[in-house]
């Protein structure tokens, strides 16, 4: 049956997922099939790996259907975003925020958005096979009606899809990834702050031993996160400095006419 075939595919996907992970050396959760009731979870994880990208994940049949979106989601219907389908992930991975070890996308994971999703397609499996899944999101940042469509190999890979926002009250010409770049799990945290201890349940309790290959790897990740953070702060400091300089020069220019007026007044009195 279709359900049995889907279950077989899910188990195969989780087996592939587990084969890439070393759970004794990482805070990332192990693969597990979850059976639960209630609204379906969706998450978008911002992943600073070799290249910054976003991972869209939709709960379905106990796992998370997953797509890597290089530029992140767009709420502008005109802006179709490439989404590369990846292996299904375990449900428990959905709320993960922390560090991924070397070997399968080493880097930092930020929980950029999460909430619930509802398929607008009656049969999700059939929609995926057809390559046209319509759904609604209700998250902190992403809401309303969406569609993810397969490109069917037109100049792309077999796993190439497009993530598109439908026109509704939640659409607009805003770059949502720039407008709202920070974590929704750790309030207003960037990558550097995720590593700095604001998420102790994930980062501090799984801190690697100093030295060795693992220590060197984490050192590089931390340095990269800090450079991202300092770059933003540095830009902000420059603008503040410019503002201060212009304010001082304006005050000086304003003071000159006053000084001239005062000297003229003294001359008249004499």
Label every model-predicted segment.
Residues 7-270:
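Catalytic cores of nucleic-acid ligases and guanylyltransferases
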């Amino acid at each position: 049956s279709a359900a049995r075939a889907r279950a077989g595919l899910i188990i195969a996907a989780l087996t592939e997922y587990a084969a890439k992970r070393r759970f004794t050396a990482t805070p990332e959760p192990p693969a597990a099939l979850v059976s639960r009731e209630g609204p379906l979870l969706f998450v978008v994880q911002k992943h600073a790996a070799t290249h910054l990208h976003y991972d869209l994940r939709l709960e379905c049949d106990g796992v998370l259907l997953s797509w890597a979106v290089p530029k992140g989601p767009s709420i502008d219907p005109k802006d179709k975003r490439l989404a590369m389908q990846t292996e299904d992930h375990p449900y428990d991975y959905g709320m993960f925020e922390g560090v991924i070890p070397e070997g399968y996308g080493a880097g930092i994971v930020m929980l950029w958005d999460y909430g619930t999703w509802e398929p607008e397609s009656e049969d999700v499996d059939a929609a995926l096979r057809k390559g046209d899944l319509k759904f609604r999101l209700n998250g902190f940042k992403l809401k309303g009606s969406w569609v993810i469509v397969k490109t069917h190999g037109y100049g792309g890979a077999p796993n190439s899809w497009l993530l598109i926002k439908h026109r509704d009250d939640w659409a607009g010409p805003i770059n949502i990834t720039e407008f709202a770049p920070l974590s929704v799990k750790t309030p207003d945290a960037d990558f550097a702050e995720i590593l700095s201890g604001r998420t102790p349940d994930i980062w501090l309790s799984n801190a690697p031993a100093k030295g060795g290959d693992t220590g060197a790897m984490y050192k590089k990740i931390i340095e990269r996160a800090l450079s991202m953070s300092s770059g933003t702060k540095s830009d902000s400091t420059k603008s503040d400095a410019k503002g201060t300089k212009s304010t001082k020069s304006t005050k000086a220019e304003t003071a000159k006419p006053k000084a001239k007026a005062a000297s003229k007044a003294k001359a008249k009195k004499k």
